[in-house]
Structure formats: structure tokens, C-alpha cells
């Protein structure tokens, strides 16, 4: 190993005292004696640096933990050795110059930055661009800062308070703008020099001196907005602010909570409560919280993202802090620390808004004494929302009630999308265009489930007239004639069980029922609810009924309910199925008549259901959907053969009805389809289905309903225990 000392990385030119990299010492001879700004290589001289702006991975992690607002956005990382060459100290203000642009920042040491280079946190200057960094000299402290603001937002005291917090401990130069984000929108702030300062600085180099003058905001300074430019035009700074939350449509419960626990206490000079608010996207959370910020203007600080929360780091001006974030991840330690700091300040009221309360750490949740969920709007809330947005889209007032009735599951955002789409939809009238647009919009409230208003009518189900009437009495009558039930002092059924052989239209009946009743239809199959993760199956049941209540009136259809509701202690049951059944029973007990949620279940094996599920108050009615009788078979066959041509239509249908005794509805449909396939097999151009084709189809499709199943249904109907 050589004993020679390693050459220093930086060398000082003996002629001009410029500091350059050792490898650039020869190239420096071409620029020796010239101003630093003309150098094409990195160098430092007399407090001025000429070097490249480079990228540093996770640069914000090298900043001091209390760097927030302007200080964070305008920090400049620089090597400690480079700082010593320039005679700079940490957090000292410097001017960055690139082309015709210049701005003020503060330096902070970082060993990851190469010698004679800088890493500017702001994206104002692109990476790998040559910049000039120079010290600012004397800085004037200001107790009052006058600015002009350019933004598309309404200027109000809330924004003024945010700017005061953001520009705290900042270094600025007059007529040089600062760009920032507020409520997700761009805001450009330009410091304006007082007229007295302009007059005192008048001289030969007036403009140059004023533009290079650096000022700093003192502790407790005040900001004054001179004028506001909104979308390029000048307007009054402060506009009329709302006094309550009546401008926001819907959200009745959440609005009342905020009025009672936040707004009223503030006006009465009392301490407000911290509130946790959550709800689906498009439900109006952000709109509501922005309105709260306007109502309590001057007392609030609005934080619209985790990034803003981390920037402010708990430093806010108002005593009401609104934190509007979609999700607060546990891994985001800096945001969690900032929120914890806010909640730990007894003088502050925190309104936290998230998408789901379940994802919030329990340590935070217990610190909110009041919680409010913004649910999917009810009919009255939808009507209120339409009254607020109808004028925007020129939607007639007389149609508001009709639209509100038929938009179950629509959030406020969905209703806006509906009226917007209706302007371009097909139809001669407003209502026709709205109905066309509604088919194209999937409501937010029902997206995560298979939920819809099915396009199936009673006419699509052949025969079964008595069965249809019985089901209508159990489901549709309570919706259309509630006064009749009140007159007799009885409650409508909470649940209905459809049982019978496979293929007898139980699912089709359920869909037609939802369509005729104009109710949402939420369909799940029993096995789909099971999960290998402990507790997930029970949570699926809870979520199912929770969403059903939100988008009521709803029919919750459980197909193959025997997979979930099998008798406890039987061979089919297991630990998971028993827990799921217990959760299902709990949810059924919690269904109040005012919830407008009906459980409709279907099974082929009613004998295997747990007796607790079948008691009155849960599955009140058990309706047998049996094999089609002669009249029903005729109706089904006539419906399925409408487009078929026969040699003798009447005789063919009569023969089919006679020969399909014991066939289910699905098997009758299969017979018709198979006969048509045999006709096409003989000739692809065939137009008539012969009786011989039906004979072949009857031989291929046979009745598969076993006799022991029919005995089970008879025993169940009579209340006898089955031996099967």
C-alpha cells in the first residue's frame, strides 16, 4: 500500500482563490479570473457556487424533522464541505439563479450530495441543470407581509390563516412568486413591497435593488392580501361566507353532528369536540368539510392530504383543524406522528375524515368522542341534493321527487354524474333522458356487491299465478300499502324462504320480485361467504347487511342458504359455518321494519336448515316452489317456443304438456332448446321444428327430480322431521 497521502477532492486556485474539484483543476485555467457565473465547470468563489442540481433518493428524509411549509419546499441540500467553502451555515438563506428565474431557499447539509453540487427539493428547476447559488446578505425581518394571490379558489380568512402558517419562517424576495397547494388547487403568492420602502429605495438601480432585496417573516407576523386574481381576473378578496351548512345537500346526520358538537360550541366560546367522519367516495365528505371551514372561517386550518399533514407537522394557526385524507396508513409514521401531535393538544379540535373507520388505528379512533358516518343518501337526502344541484344542470323541479325515488344507492357525486349525462342521453323528455343515463351509471353505494334492480318481470315467468300472488303479498304489499299493516298492528315479514326442487325458477322469481317492487337486489351464494381467514366470513355477513341498509329498499337474496344455515351439530356444519350462522341470526334480529331490508332465501334442502333460522321474526314465511303443474308447463312452453314454427302448434304444445309431467322449468327450457338443436343438425337452414325433434329431445332430457326430495318437501311443509 502506498504511503502517499490521498490528494484532496477540492483544490483552491492560487490566482483567483476559486475552489474547484481536483479533476477540474486544468479545465479551470480557461475560466480563471472570469466571473463565477461564466464558468462551465463546478466552482465556488467569494460565497457564490456554480454547480449542477442533482437528484437524491428520499431527499426529504435528510431534512430536519421540524421543516414544514415554505421551509420544507424551499430547502436545498448541499455537502458540508461545500458549505464550508462558501462560508454558509445550516438554514442560512441563499438565492438560486437559473436562466432568468431566481428564488430564495435555505441550505441544509447532506453527505449524499456530491461536492460542489446541490439538490433542490422543489421541482422548480430540472435535474442536471447548471445553477448559481449565492448568499443573500442582509435580511429584513417583517412583522406584516402584503401579498397578491392568484387562484381559482374563493379567498377567505381560512386561506389567509393557511398562508400565514405556510410562510412562517420563510425568506422571500419582492415580486418573486411562491407556488403552493391549497385544497388540492394551485395558489400563487407574490410578496409586494410597501410603498414606503419603494420610495426610500429610489435611485439609479431601483429595480435591481428591490428585486434582490430579501425579507423574512418574524414570529407572530400578519399577512395582508391586497387583491385576488381568480382565473386571471381581479375580484374582491373576501366574499360573503356561509353561516351554516344548509348549502350542502343531504348528509343530514353528519351536518347535525357538526352543528351540535363543533359549530355551536365555537360560537358560544366553548371547547368543541373532535369528530371522526367517514363515508364512501362521492358521499360529500370533502364538500361538507370545506363548508365547515368557510362557516368557521378564521378559526380553521384545512389539511387536504397526508402530504399537507406532514408539511405542517402539527403547526397550525386555528384551533379547529380539519384533516381530510382518504386513508391514514400505519406505515406513514410522519403523518401519524403529526396527527398524534394535533390530537394531543387539548386546545385544538380535530375533524378527521377518512374513507373507512375500520382502517383507522384504534389508538387514534378512541381519541374521537364523536363519530359520524356519511351513509348512502336516503330518498329525502337525494331529494335535498337534487334541490341544490338541479339549477346547475337546468333540471325541472317537478321531476326531482321521481328521480329521488328511483336512484337507490346513488351518492351525491353519482347524482351529479346522472344529471350531467342526462343532458346528452337519448330521449325526448327530461325523464326519458334521465332513465337512459341511469342505465349507464353504476351507483357507488352498490359497486362492491352484485346489486342491481333486475330487468325481469312476472311476465318472464310462465304460470305459477298463485305462487306469484303469495310472494307479492309477502313482499310488495308492505312496500306499497304500509298503512294496511299499520291498521292491523302487524309487521311485514322480515324474511322469506323459497324451497323446492332444482330448476323451478326460485332465483328468477326473486329477481322478478325485486324488479316489480322497484327494490335493489343484492344476490349472494352461500359458499361465497366462506373465507379461510378467521373472522372474514362473519365480517362479510356484517358488511352485506350494512350496505343493504344503506341502499334500502333492498332484497338480500341468499341462494343455497343451506351452505350457511345448516343445522348446528350436523355432519354438514363446522366451526366456521356455525359462526357465520350465528352472525346471520344476529343480523336478522337487528332488521327493524323501518330498515326496509328483506331477506329472501332459496334452498333445495329445507330439512337441513337450523331451526333457529326458521323461527318467526327471521324467515317468517316458507313458500314452496314446486314442479310446474299442467297449466304452468303450458305457459312455460308457449313462452319458450314463441319464435319456433311447428307443423301443428296447438297439437305440439298439447303433446309436450302431456309428456313432461314431473319436469322442472329448467328442464322444459332444455327440451325446447335441444329440439331446435336437433332440427339444425338435420339442416342448418331448417325453419320448422318437427315433432320427431321433440321426441329426440325428450329422450335426451329426462326429469331428474328424485322422489325422496318430494317427500322431504311434503314433510317440511307439514312440519314433520324428514328421514332422508
Swiss-Prot record:
UniProt-listed Enzyme Commission number(s): 3.6.4.10
GO biological process, one term: cell division
CDD domains in alphabetical order: RecA-like_CDC48_r2-like
GO molecular function, one term: protein kinase inhibitor activity
Domain of life according to the entry: Eukaryota
SUPFAM superfamilies to which the protein is assigned, alphabetical: P-loop containing nucleoside triphosphate hydrolases
Function: ATP-dependent chaperone which uses the energy provided by ATP hydrolysis to generate mechanical force to disassemble protein complexes. Required for various steps of embryonic mitosis including centrosome duplication, spindle assembly, ER dynamics and cell cycle progression. Regulates the stability and activity of kinase air-2, a component of the chromosomal passenger complex (CPC). Inhibits air-2 kinase activity from metaphase to late telophase and negatively regulates air-2 stability during mitotic exit.
Name of the gene: cdc-48.3
Keyword Cytoplasm tagged: yes
Location in the cell: Cytoplasm
UniProt cross-references to Pfam families, sorted A to Z: AAA, AAA_lid_3
Reaction catalysed by this enzyme: ATP + H2O = ADP + phosphate + H(+)
Origin organism lineage: Eukaryota, Metazoa, Ecdysozoa, Nematoda, Chromadorea
GO cellular component: cytoplasm
Binding site for ATP 1: 281-287
Disruption-associated phenotype: RNAi-mediated knockdown causes embryonic lethality. The first embryonic cell divisions have mitotic spindle and chromosome segregation defects, and mitotic progression is significantly delayed. At late telophase/G1, air-2 accumulates at the spindle midbody abnormally persisting following cleavage furrow ingression and into the next mitotic cycle. Loss of inhibition of air-2 kinase activity. Also, causes defects in ER dynamics characterized by a failure of the ER to form a sheet structure at the onset of mitosis and remains in large aggregates throughout mitosis.
EC category name: hydrolase
Similarity-based family: Belongs to the AAA ATPase family. AFG2 subfamily.
Entry note about domains: The first ATP-binding region binds ATP with low affinity whereas the second ATP-binding region binds ATP with high affinity.
Annotated InterPro entries: AAA+_ATPase, AAA_ATPase_domain, AAA_lid_3, ATPase_AAA_core, ATPase_AAA_CS, P-loop_NTPase
Gene3D superfamilies recorded: 1.10.8.60, P-loop containing nucleotide triphosphate hydrolases
Known partners and oligomeric status: Homohexamer; ATP binding induces oligomerization. Forms a ring-shaped particle of about 12 nm diameter, that displays 6-fold radial symmetry. Interacts (via N-terminus) with kinase air-2; the interaction is direct and inhibits air-2 kinase activity in an ATPase-dependent manner.
Main location per the UniProt record: cytoplasm
Name this protein carries in UniProt: ATPase family protein 2 homolog
Amino acid at each position: 500500500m502506498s504511503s502517499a497521502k490521498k490528494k484532496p477532492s477540492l483544490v483552491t486556485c492560487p490566482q483567483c482563490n476559486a475552489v474547484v474539484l481536483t479533476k477540474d483543476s486544468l479545465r479551470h485555467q480557461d475560466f480563471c479570473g472570469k466571473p463565477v457565473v461564466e464558468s462551465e465547470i463546478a466552482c465556488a468563489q467569494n460565497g457564490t457556487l456554480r454547480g449542477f442540481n442533482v437528484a437524491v433518493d428520499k431527499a426529504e428524509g435528510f431534512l430536519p424533522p421540524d421543516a414544514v411549509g415554505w421551509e420544507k419546499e424551499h430547502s436545498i441540500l448541499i455537502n458540508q464541505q461545500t458549505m464550508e467553502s462558501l462560508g454558509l451555515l445550516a438554514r442560512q438563506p441563499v438565492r438560486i439563479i437559473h436562466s432568468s428565474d431566481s428564488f430564495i431557499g435555505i441550505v441544509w447539509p447532506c453527505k449524499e450530495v456530491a461536492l460542489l453540487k446541490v439538490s433542490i427539493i422543489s421541482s422548480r428547476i430540472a435535474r442536471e441543470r447548471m445553477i448559481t447559488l449565492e448568499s443573500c446578505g442582509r435580511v429584513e425581518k417583517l412583522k406584516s407581509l402584503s401579498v397578491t394571490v392568484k387562484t381559482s379558489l374563493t379567498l377567505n380568512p381560512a386561506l389567509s390563516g393557511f398562508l400565514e402558517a405556510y410562510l412562517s419562517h420563510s425568506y422571500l424576495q419582492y415580486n418573486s412568486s411562491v407556488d403552493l397547494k391549497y385544497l388540492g388547487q394551485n395558489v400563487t403568492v407574490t410578496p409586494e413591497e410597501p410603498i414606503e420602502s419603494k420610495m426610500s429605495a429610489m435611485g439609479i438601480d431601483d429595480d435591481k435593488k428591490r428585486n434582490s432585496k430579501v425579507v423574512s417573516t418574524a414570529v407572530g407576523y400578519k399577512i395582508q392580501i391586497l387583491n385576488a386574481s381568480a382565473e386571471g381576473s381581479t375580484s374582491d378578496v373576501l366574499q360573503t361566507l356561509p353561516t351554516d351548512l344548509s348549502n350542502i345537500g343531504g348528509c343530514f346526520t353528519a351536518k347535525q353532528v357538526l352543528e351540535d358538537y363543533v359549530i355551536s360550541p365555537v360560537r358560544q366560546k366553548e371547547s368543541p369536540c373532535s369528530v371522526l367522519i367517514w363515508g364512501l367516495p362521492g358521499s360529500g365528505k370533502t364538500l361538507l368539510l370545506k363548508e365547515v371551514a368557510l362557516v368557521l372561517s378564521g378559526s380553521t386550518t384545512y389539511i387536504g392530504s397526508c402530504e399537507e399533514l406532514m408539511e405542517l407537522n402539527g403547526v397550525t394557526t386555528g384551533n379547529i383543524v380539519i384533516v381530510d385524507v382518504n386513508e391514514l396508513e400505519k406505515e406513514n409514521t410522519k403523518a401519524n406522528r403529526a396527527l398524534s401531535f394535533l390530537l394531543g393538544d387539548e386546545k385544538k379540535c380535530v375533524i378527521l375524515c377518512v374513507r373507512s373507520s375500520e382502517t383507522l388505528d384504534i389508538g387514534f379512533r378512541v381519541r374521537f368522542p364523536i363519530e359520524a358516518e356519511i351513509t348512502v343518501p336516503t330518498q329525502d337526502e337525494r331529494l335535498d341534493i337534487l334541490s341544490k344541484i338541479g339549477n346547475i344542470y337546468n333540471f325541472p323541479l317537478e321531476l326531482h321527487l321521481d328521480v329521488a325515488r328511483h336512484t337507490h344507492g346513488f351518492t351525491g357525486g353519482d347524482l351529479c354524474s346522472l344529471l350531467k349525462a342526462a343532458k346528452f342521453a337519448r330521449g325526448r323528455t327530461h325523464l326519458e333522458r334521465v332513465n337512459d343515463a341511469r342505465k349507464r351509471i353504476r351507483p357507488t353505494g352498490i359497486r362492491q356487491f352484485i346489486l342491481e334492480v333486475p330487468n325481469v318481470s312476472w311476465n318472464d315467468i310462465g304460470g305459477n299465478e298463485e305462487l306469484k300472488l303469495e310472494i307479492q303479498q309477502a313482499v310488495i304489499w308492505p312496500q306499497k300499502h304500509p298503512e294496511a299493516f299499520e291498521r292491523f298492528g302487524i309487521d311485514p315479514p322480515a324474511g322469506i324462504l323459497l324451497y323446492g326442487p332444482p330448476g323451478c325458477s326460485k332465483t328468477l322469481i326473486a329477481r322478478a320480485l325485486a324488479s316489480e317492487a322497484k327494490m335493489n337486489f343484492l344476490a349472494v351464494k352461500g359458499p361465497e361467504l366462506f373465507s379461510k381467514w378467521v373472522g372474514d366470513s362473519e365480517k362479510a355477513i356484517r358488511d352485506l347487511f350494512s350496505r343493504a341498509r344503506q341502499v334500502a329498499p333492498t332484497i338480500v337474496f341468499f341462494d343455497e342458504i343451506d351452505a350457511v344455515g345448516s343445522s348446528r351439530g350436523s355432519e354438514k356444519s363446522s366451526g366456521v359455518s356455525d359462526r357465520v350462522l350465528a352472525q346471520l341470526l344476529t343480523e336478522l334480529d337487528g332488521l327493524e321494519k323501518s330498515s326496509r331490508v328483506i331477506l329472501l332465501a332459496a334452498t333445495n334442502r329445507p330439512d337441513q336448515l337450523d331451526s333457529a333460522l326458521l323461527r318467526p321474526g327471521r324467515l317468517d314465511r316458507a313458500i314452496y316452489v314446486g314442479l310446474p303443474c299442467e297449466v304452468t308447463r303450458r305457459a312455460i312452453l308457449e313462452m319458450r317456443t314463441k319464435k319456433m314454427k311447428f307443423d301443428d302448434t296447438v297439437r305440439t304444445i298439447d303433446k309436450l304438456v302431456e309428456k313432461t309431467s314431473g319436469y322442472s322449468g329448467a328442464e322444459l327450457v332444455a327440451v325446447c332448446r335441444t329440439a331446435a338443436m336437433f332440427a339444425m343438425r338435420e339442416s342448418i337452414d331448417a325453419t320448422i321444428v318437427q315433432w320427431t325433434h321433440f321426441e329426440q329431445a325428450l329422450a335426451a332430457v329426462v326429469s331428474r327430480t328424485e322422489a325422496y326430495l318430494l317427500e322431504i318437501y311434503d314433510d317440511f311443509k307439514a312440519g314433520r322431521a324428514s328421514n332422508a
